[in-house]
Amino acid sequence: SVGFKAGVKDYKLTYYTPDYETKDTDILAAFRVTPQPGVPPEEAGAAVAAESSTGTWTTVWTDGLTSLDRYKGRCYHIEPVAGEESQFIAYVAYPLDLFEEGSVTNMFTSIVGNVFGFKALRALRLEDLRIPNAYVKTFQGPPHGIQVERDKLNKYGRPLLGCTIKPKLGLSAKNYGRAVYECLRGGLDFTKDDENVNSQPFMRWRDRFLFCAEALYKAQAETGEIKGHYLNATAGTCEEMIKRAVFARELGVPIVMHDYLTGGFTANTSLAHYCRDNGLLLHIHRAMHAVIDRQKNHGMHFRVLAKALRLSGGDHIHSGTVVGKLEGEREITLGFVDLLRDDFVEKDRSRGIYFTQDWVSLPGVLPVASGGIHVWHMPALTEIFGDDSVLQFGGGTLGHPWGNAPGAVANRVALEACVQARNEGRDLASEGNQIIREASKWSPELAAACEVWKE
């Protein structure tokens, strides 16, 4: 008799297990599956589970040397998608032992590394992940988190204000520093390097760091508030990235920045560890996210990338605006904003949250609203995002007819007016425009901004 039965086999025999009870230590994934015509849902769901865990396309004799039952991914539930005949959600459970501790890189390589090019599927999208407590605890997470950041900055009870310095490419370091100073002097908490500002011929990183640090200290001395500028440490190698972070620390600045998707999760986690060890805050930009998350039926939802960032580490992350120039549906956005900030988030399908997620006291991340927003959006932003957020007005500060500092003043006045109105019990949704108008009566800077950007 032969030791094992050779040949190609159906995945669903081994990998579709509807009776399976998920364990607390399993990593759970929700995939939106669009199979090729004629492939039944069970087979497609099982194929996803197999290809992203222990499966290969044929029987191999080395299967006999291990326990498949202990190590295989299992498709344990399939549900139809309302309004889509050819789509369904496949739920897959992965045993914890398949993953290296503290490695977002390995988690993604395992779960989404190979299976997305699979022939039996027309399209595949990872909608959500449930990270078990045991796995969360192997990550350091954000270098500092929301509470520690507020304590370092001594700013409480309101969202923080930021601004990306434009034009993003072409300024010299000295002029760039001047723009930073004007914004901070006017009343912003932070200014930001654009995500594509690294170290180009017209402005090398070291010069920029120096002039921005000078701008920061000057603005701090003038205003009596702590100021920050997100110095982009993203670089072509990890060594160079850490070198830039070290220089930022030597200058004594409070915060650096990283593009976590283009830079990669390994680099990002290294930088996050450095930042915690050296008291630097870490601002994360999500350049390249739309390549991965924009298609509705293929790729990965941003909430998965956001969860991954909280594990890998970052104190701020860009997460859409709900109101500006970039797309983002309100409930769905609020769903992953809460996943970033809160310690425990209940499953809620109306907000796109497929699993209850317990972060077991991992620090939270501040969501950053950025992109096409201006003073008229302030009431809505204050209401939607609440206190724990960073509101970033690039053109909405620098586009002010009187210059950067008055633009910053306008934003700060608008924010303080909205926070005060909210604290007095007024309804920002219905009275927002009126609140801004009232505030603009005693702030010429805000009045000028209201003129430029009509409601």
UniProtKB/Swiss-Prot annotation:
Subunit text: Heterohexadecamer of 8 large chains and 8 small chains; disulfide-linked. The disulfide link is formed within the large subunit homodimers.
UniProt similarity note: Belongs to the RuBisCO large chain family. Type I subfamily.
Cellular component terms (Gene Ontology): chloroplast
Binding-site residues for substrate, renumbered to this chain: 114, 164, 168, 286, 318, 370
Alphabetical list of InterPro entries matching this protein: RuBisCO (IPR033966), RuBisCo_large_chain_AS (IPR020878), RuBisCO_lsu_C (IPR000685), RuBisCO_lsu_C_sf (IPR036376), RuBisCO_lsu_fd_N (IPR017443), RuBisCO_lsu_N_sf (IPR036422), RuBisCO_lsuI (IPR020888)
Enzyme class, spelled out: lyase
Places the protein is found: Plastid, Chloroplast
Catalytic reaction equation(s): 2 (2R)-3-phosphoglycerate + 2 H(+) = D-ribulose 1,5-bisphosphate + CO2 + H2O; D-ribulose 1,5-bisphosphate + O2 = 2-phosphoglycolate + (2R)-3-phosphoglycerate + 2 H(+)
Modified-residue entries (N6,N6,N6-trimethyllysine), positions: 5
Residue numbers annotated as active site: 166, 285
Keyword Magnesium carried by entry: yes
Function: RuBisCO catalyzes two reactions: the carboxylation of D-ribulose 1,5-bisphosphate, the primary event in carbon dioxide fixation, as well as the oxidative fragmentation of the pentose substrate in the photorespiration process. Both reactions occur simultaneously and in competition at the same active site.
Binding site for Mg(2+): 192, 194-195
Assigned EC number: 4.1.1.39
Comment on bound cofactor: Binds 1 Mg(2+) ion per subunit.
Residues under site feature: Transition state stabilizer: 325
Annotated positions of the N6-carboxylysine modification: 192
Modifications the protein undergoes after translation, according to the UniProt entry: The disulfide bond which can form in the large chain dimeric partners within the hexadecamer appears to be associated with oxidative stress and protein turnover.
GO biological process annotation, one example: photorespiration
The protein, known as: Ribulose bisphosphate carboxylase large chain
GO terms for MF: magnesium ion binding; monooxygenase activity; ribulose-bisphosphate carboxylase activity
Cofactor (UniProt): Mg(2+)
Note: The basic functional RuBisCO is composed of a large chain homodimer in a 'head-to-tail' conformation. In form I RuBisCO this homodimer is arranged in a barrel-like tetramer with the small subunits forming a tetrameric 'cap' on each end of the 'barrel'.
